Amino acid sequence: MVHILSSALSLLRLGAAVSAAPAPAPTAAPNVADALAAVEKRAGSCTFSDPAVPLPAIKSKASCATIVISAVAVPSGTTLDLTGLKSGTHVVFEGTTTFGYEEWSGPLVSVSGTDITVTGASGSVLDGNGAKYWDGKGTNGGKTKPKFFYAHSLKGKSSINNVKILNSPVQVFSINSASGLTLSGITIDNSAGNSLGHNTDAFDVGSSTDITISGANVQNQDDCLAINSGTGITFTGGTCSGGHGLSIGSVGGRSDNVVSDVIIESSTVKNSANGVRIKTVLGATGSVSGVTYKDITLSGITSYGVVIEQDYENGSPTGKPTSGVPITGVTLSNVHGTVSSSATNVYVLCAKCSGWTWDVNVTGGKTSTKCAGLPSGVKC
């Protein structure tokens, strides 16, 4: 049965009551004593540190200026619920945070609020127990797998810093309905899932504005970055390995189908299926505009160095592009590197694309003979 931590006993209130009372009798129930020992509340700082006692109710979490989660074991089927925090709250992860196994959709962690800071202390890890879920099917069948970290409705000047995610069952960060959010120094290590992990997107962005992701180090089995909608999105200084590259889309078929003012720069994509990718949905409506890829280095790419296409249907290309999601004002500047001999250097399939700036030097693979609808100055 799926539980939400906010429905459990409020140990914070219980801890405050006990601190004002005489010392507990030696015969006190061990579970209660352990729980009380796990909660320390001083001057608005709330610490949860007993591995056997996951983050409790926190019905009183709104009174915590700082929440420290130290070596906590979150029960199976449970969301570590850090939503609705008071403005300016600082959340710190210490030690290893673990999550029990259960087939469910998640998320494992959810955070929301205004001017929220989430920090991973030195040596801390959030371990998603992915090996128990990976079956080669991802979200397309098999076991039901929980998504990892919802960064939804984070507003103001919120940030997530130096957090290390290990072994995510599927998608890692879902960034949705957020504004002014910065993620820096994030490490995502799903390398243990290289044979059976699937749909382990690192950063999925939707319906968000003014988002910056800097210094990410990602090893996964799907998109390193996937921007499905949003404006003012920056990804810089990232290293992506093992996945599907730096992607816009697929765009179309959702409630929000506009991507604009995106900068993806100073990043490396290696040992991945694709390097740079923009894809829109067949027959859908929306727009992609003002997207810049700058100073992108590719190596060990196995499918496409650069792929931009307007023909996606049910997650797969059809070879027949449609014009309902025009791709305009795209700049590829100093996108360079190598692909494998069986891969394709560049593939562009457009029905409505215009106003592109093209500075691409990708070598080592095949030259596509199926490119179509190329904007002026673009070469396959």
From Swiss-Prot:
Species this protein is from: Sclerotinia sclerotiorum
A GO BP annotation: cell wall organization
Spans traversing the lipid bilayer: none
First and last residue of the signal peptide: 1-17
Catalytic activity: (1,4-alpha-D-galacturonosyl)n+m + H2O = (1,4-alpha-D-galacturonosyl)n + (1,4-alpha-D-galacturonosyl)m
Assigned keywords, A-Z: Cell wall biogenesis/degradation, Cleavage on pair of basic residues, Disulfide bond, Glycoprotein, Glycosidase, Hydrolase, Repeat, Secreted, Signal, Zymogen
Propeptide: 18-42
Glycosylation sites: N361
Catalytic center residues: D222, H244
Record GO terms (molecular function): polygalacturonase activity
This protein's name: Endo-polygalacturonase
Enzyme class: hydrolase
Spans of repeat PbH1: 178-207, 208-229, 230-250, 259-280, 288-310, 322-343
Gene3D superfamilies (alphabetical): Single-stranded right-handed beta-helix, Pectin lyase-like
Keyword Glycoprotein: yes
Gene symbol of the encoding locus: PG1
Major location (coarse): secreted
GO cellular component: extracellular region
Disulfide bonds: C46-C64, C224-C240, C350-C353, C371-C380
Subcellular location: Secreted
Listed SUPFAM superfamilies: Pectin lyase-like
